């Protein structure tokens, strides 16, 4: 059976770590997307304020299979 997948891009952040930002983004995507088959982290950035790292940000693709 043939399948068709879609890719959507999201940005997530965490004050603690890149790993936590990825987890936060994935958990949020799971609330609205069904059939997730993969995640690809495209970019990692750090927000800086007053010479301190204040937020870890990731840009990621969420891959999921379309229904029907």
Model-found features: residue ranges?
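Short N-terminal signal/transit or membrane-insertion segments
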Residues: 1-2, 62
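Short, well-ordered alpha-helical segments
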Residues: 2-37
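A cross-kingdom feature marking charged/low-complexity
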Residues: 44-68
């Amino acid at each position: 059976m043939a399948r068709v997948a879609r890719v959507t891009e999201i940005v997530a952040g965490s004050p603690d770590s890149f790993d936590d930002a990825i987890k936060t983004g994935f958990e949020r995507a799971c609330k609205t997307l069904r059939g997730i088959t993969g995640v690809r982290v495209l970019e990692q950035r750090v927000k800086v304020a007053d010479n301190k790292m204040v937020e870890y940000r990731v840009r990621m693709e969420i891959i999921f299979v379309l229904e029907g």
